[in-house]
UniProtKB/Swiss-Prot annotation:
Assembly mode: Interacts (via C-terminus) with CIPK1.
Domain YTH: 245-382
Pfam name, any one: YTH
Protein name listed in UniProt: YTH domain-containing protein ECT1
Localization per Swiss-Prot or TrEMBL: Nucleus; Cytoplasm
GO terms assigned for molecular function: mRNA binding
Species in which this protein is naturally found: Arabidopsis thaliana
Record has ATP-binding as a keyword: no
InterPro entries noted in UniProt: YTH_domain, YTH_prot
GO BP terms in the entry: calcium-mediated signaling
UniProt-listed PROSITE patterns: YTH
Keyword Nucleus attributed: yes
CDD domains membership: YTH
Keyword annotations of the record: Cytoplasm, Nucleus, RNA-binding
């Protein structure tokens, strides 16, 4: 999960409403009641670093395709229909990972004309709040189909397993609603669900939800510094030079997943990414000299890196954690965070990678390796940059999002089970 280029808003600093009341309050759009509840995500523990790695694992259970991890949508539409559809028989790009064209990275494709480069903010709904549902079920490892498109303006992806219940393909766009076929009507009578992935929280100056969250609400969602041990990160003694070290760029599809990575001390990439990182870990351990494996975290389409963590254990390919925003990541490994701050891409764009067609490191795919020389330069920039913000500022914001997502998933599961029971009775 990383890692494919990487994933789903009221917060615990003020009294939480009952789940039913929250959903009622969030149903601002005229179609909100038609959106099926379909989120799940697991156990929540203490603030960052207080929950042990692997505390909530379900190795024997496949997670449905999701992510989690939720950009806000504005939106425009063709005609009077604000929801876009892609036909069910639309050709798939056949990429190995549904969320990302390559591993966990979003990929440019020839379908950019399907995405909407414009936005409007007239009617807020679940989408704009970042609480969209229809998290995907796992038919196979990645779902029945796989495809990713990039609008050129924001990273987007098609929803998976949307063939169920007669649904056609539905697009998911990071910032904007997508253009629709046939004026918003596809091959289904039911409106498509779209999963939002948030690349930045309310700490960001370009956080796009002003009509729903006013300044006082956003202030209330800011993290109480006393709840997080900030002294554990950004230490002055962290080394800037290494005799041996390995560096990899990690691209997450949502800040929700990075939040949980810091909180639980674990990460998961795609099957290919997990194998690559696991091999690097064992190779580093076999080295006669100390050789740490560092992970440079960035959230897809965020325009920044969010920090640096160290891979401190091998991949457990049989353990699946339940708290990722998208329920599809198989396997996980422990990490230790050293630096947590927002570092803009502009500070790193001059560093180009020969092993990636001399592209800037900011244009890397998930698990892109960075050589020792460039990795050392990046560490120095990370340490020296005096950032005013970091993902820890939005701790309570993401905690509340996780609770809402989890409750919606539980409700959707219950509805699915109740529906299956009803069908069994009718057939008997």
């Amino acid at each position: 999960m990383a890692g494919a280029a990487s994933s789903d808003r009221l917060v615990t600093s003020f009294p939480l409403l009952d789940t039913a009341d929250l959903f009622q309050d969030l149903s601002l759009g005229s179609d909100a009641n038609e959106v099926p509840m379909n989120f799940t995500k697991g156990s929540f523990q203490h603030p960052y670093g207080h929950a042990p790695y692997g505390a909530s694992s379900h190795g024997s259970e496949r997670r449905p395709n999701m992510n989690a991890g939720n950009l806000l949508n504005g939106g425009d539409s063709i005609g009077s229909y604000p929801w876009g559809y892609i036909p069910a028989n639309y050709p798939s790009g056949g990429y190995p990972d549904p969320r990302f064209g390559y591993d966990r990275n979003s990929n440019h494709s020839s379908f950019s004309h399907l995405m909407n480069p414009h936005s409007s903010q007239e009617v807020p709904s679940f989408d704009q709040l970042g609480y969209n549902d229809h998290l995907y079920s796992n038919h196979g490892l990645y779902g029945l189909y796989g495809n990713v498109i990039d609008s050129g303006h924001a990273y987007g992806t098609f929803g998976y397993d949307s063939w169920k219940l007669g649904r056609g393909w539905y697009p998911v766009d990071g910032y904007r609603k997508t253009r629709s076929f046939n004026h918003g009507r596809g091959y289904s009578d039911e409106k498509a669900d779209r999963l939002n992935e948030l690349c930045r929280g309310p700490r960001s100056s370009d956080f796009k939800n002003p009509q729903v969250l006013n300044s006082s609400m956003l202030d209330a969602m800011k993290q109480d510094v006393s709840a997080v041990d900030l002294q554990r990160y950004n230490g002055e003694n962290f080394p800037e030079s290494f005799v041996k070290a390995k560096f990899f760029v990690i691209k997450s599809y949502s800040e929700d997943d990075v939040h949980n990575c810091i909180k639980y001390g674990a990460w998961s990439s795609t099957p290919t990414g997990n194998k690559k990182l696991n091999a690097a870990y064992y190779e580093a351990k076999e080295n006669s000299q100390e050789c740490p494996v560092y992970l440079l975290f960035s959230v897809n389409a965020s325009g920044q890196f969010v920090g640096l963590a160290e891979m401190v254990g091998p991949v457990d390919f049989n353990k699946t954690m339940e708290y990722w925003q998208q329920d599809k990541w198989i396997g996980c490994f422990p990490v230790k965070w050293h630096i947590i701050k927002d570092i803009p891409n502009s500070l790193l764009r001059h560093i180009t990678l020969a092993n990636n067609e001399n592209k800037p490191v900011t244009n890397s795919r998930d698990t892109q390796e960075v050589n020792l020389e460039h990795g050392t330069k990046i560490i120095k920039i990370f340490k020296e940059y005096m950032s005013k913000t970091c993902i820890l500022d939005d701790y309570k914001f993401y905690e509340t999002r996780q609770k809402i997502i989890r409750d919606k998933k539980i409700k959707q599961k219950k509805q699915a089970l109740d529906g299956a029971s009803g069908e069994t009775i009718n057939l008997s």
